[in-house]
Amino acid sequence: MNENFHSFHEKELRDGQVESVSAGSSPPCDKDSSALLAFRGISISELKNHSVLQALTAEANAWEPRVVSTEVLQAQEEWEAVESIHPETGSRASMDQPGQLISFSEALQHFQTVDLSSFKKRIQPTIRRTGLAALRHYLFGPPKLHQGLREERDLVLTIAQCGLDSQDPMHGRVLQTIYKKLTGSKFDCALHGDHWEDLGFQGTNPATDLRGAGFLALLHLLYLVMDSKTLLMAREILRLSRHHIQQFPFCLMSVNITRIAIQALREECLSRECNRQQKVIPVVNSFYAATFLRLAHIWRTQHKTISDSGFVLKDLEMSAKKSPRRLLKTLETYLAGVSKGQASLLGTQKCSGPQAPHSKDLTFTGVCDLPSHLSEGTWLI
C-alpha cells in the first residue's frame, strides 16, 4: 500500500515537473524564466555539470576571468577554511592530511622548530669587503643590522640553503598550496609532472630550479599566493608570463627575484628598513613582492621578451638595492589600489595565446647565468 502511494506520489511530481516546463500547458514566459523552471528538478550538486550553466559561465578568453576582486578571493579563502573542518568533531583536520592548504606562518614555524644547524654552517650573512670597497661601505653604506635582528636574518639565509624534500609532508603541502592558489584547482596534483612546466618551472621537478634560493623561493611564492591582494597580483603576473609574445617562465622568474632579495639582505641594503620595522622576514617578503611587481611593470610597458631576461634582472637588481624604500612604497600604493579595485597590471591586455611554448622550450637567462663581468660573482648565500 505504502509502496503504491509513494510510486503514485513520485509519478505525480514527475508529471507536475513535465507540465511546468511544457509550452502547451503553462502560461507564456520569457527565456530566463523557462531556464529557471528547467533547473527545478536538478539537484544542487549536479548544477555545476549542466551544459547551460557551463555555457553561461564560460570565459571567452579561456583559462580564467580577467579580473577577480579581492572580495571574491577572500570569500574563496573563507570557504576553504570551512572545508577544513571535520563535521563529526568540529575541529580542524590534521595538518599532515593530504590536500590541506598551508599558510606562510605555519610553514615558517616548521623551519623555526626543526634542527637546521647543518644548513646554517653554510651561510655567509654579509658580503666580505676589502680595501677601498670596505672603507666606502663603512663611510657611506647603509647602517648595520641591529644585533637583535641578526638571528632572524640568519634564519632567512639558512632556509635559502634548504632544498625541496618531496618526502617531507610540509614541503609537499607548500607545493600543493602554490599550485592550487595559482590555478584555482581544488584537487591535489603530483609533485612531479608537466603541470609544473605550465606554471613556469623549467622541468617536471620543481626542486631542480631552486638553485641559489633553496626553499626560500617556495616560501616567497607561498607568501605571494596566501594573501588575497598579492594573490591577485600573482595571477596577473602569471597571465603576463603566458603572453604569446612576451612569455616567460613565471616560477623561474620568481626564483630569480628571491635571489635578488637574498643578495640585498646580505649586502645590508635592507638593514635600514629592517631596523625601522624591527623585523626581517616581513621586510624581505615585501621586498620580494615589490621587486616582482616592478619587473612585471617593466616587462609589460617596455615590451620585454625572454631574450631580455638576464639584463632586465640585472638592472632590476641594481635599482632595487639602490632604493628599496621607494620600491616598497610602490608596492604599498599598488596594494592600496587593489583593495579599492583600482589597480591592475595588465588592464585589458590579452596575455595568453595558442603559440605560447612550455617553459622548458624557452631560453631563459637568470641573474646567475649572466657573464661574470656583469653578475660580479656574488651569488654565494
Swiss-Prot record:
<dbReference type="InterPro" id="IPR050868">
    <property type="entry name" value="ELMO_domain-containing"/>
</dbReference>
<dbReference type="GO" id="GO:0005856">
    <property type="term" value="C:cytoskeleton"/>
</dbReference>
<dbReference type="Pfam" id="PF04727">
    <property type="entry name" value="ELMO_CED12"/>
</dbReference>
<keyword id="KW-0343">GTPase activation</keyword>
<dbReference type="GO" id="GO:0005737">
    <property type="term" value="C:cytoplasm"/>
</dbReference>
<dbReference type="GO" id="GO:0060091">
    <property type="term" value="C:kinocilium"/>
</dbReference>
<keyword id="KW-0963">Cytoplasm</keyword>
<dbReference type="GO" id="GO:0032420">
    <property type="term" value="C:stereocilium"/>
</dbReference>
<protein>
    <recommendedName>
        <fullName>ELMO domain-containing protein 3</fullName>
    </recommendedName>
</protein>
<keyword id="KW-0966">Cell projection</keyword>
<keyword id="KW-0969">Cilium</keyword>
<feature type="region of interest" description="Disordered">
    <location>
        <begin position="1"/>
        <end position="31"/>
    </location>
</feature>
<feature type="domain" description="ELMO">
    <location>
        <begin position="170"/>
        <end position="324"/>
    </location>
</feature>
<feature type="compositionally biased region" description="Basic and acidic residues">
    <location>
        <begin position="1"/>
        <end position="17"/>
    </location>
</feature>
<dbReference type="InterPro" id="IPR006816">
    <property type="entry name" value="ELMO_dom"/>
</dbReference>
<keyword id="KW-0206">Cytoskeleton</keyword>
<comment type="function">
    <text>Acts as a GTPase-activating protein (GAP) for ARL2 with low specific activity.</text>
</comment>
